[in-house]
């Protein structure tokens, strides 16, 4: 009997941590979770630098959760 090691594919997580950046150009950002299968997030949230609600766009993936 021969023992072999099987290379199994690593399972991907369902959620990922992404960085959301203000569209006002203030440099303000925050991190949030989203489902891996969804499209990129766009949220309307308060930006404390300009003290207004602005759009936040997903800039980059930080890590898998």
Curated annotation (Swiss-Prot):
Keyword Transmembrane applies: no
Residues annotated as signal peptide: none
Record keywords: Mitochondrion, Ribonucleoprotein, Ribosomal protein, Transit peptide
Gene3D superfamilies registered for this protein in UniProt: Ribosomal protein L33
GO molecular function: structural constituent of ribosome
Gene Ontology BP terms: translation
Similarity comment text for this entry: Belongs to the bacterial ribosomal protein bL33 family.
Annotated PANTHER family: 39S RIBOSOMAL PROTEIN L33, MITOCHONDRIAL, LARGE RIBOSOMAL SUBUNIT PROTEIN BL33M
Subunit composition and interactions: Component of the mitochondrial ribosome large subunit (39S) which comprises a 16S rRNA and about 50 distinct proteins.
Protein name: Large ribosomal subunit protein bL33m
Lineage of the species this protein comes from: Eukaryota, Metazoa, Chordata, Craniata, Vertebrata
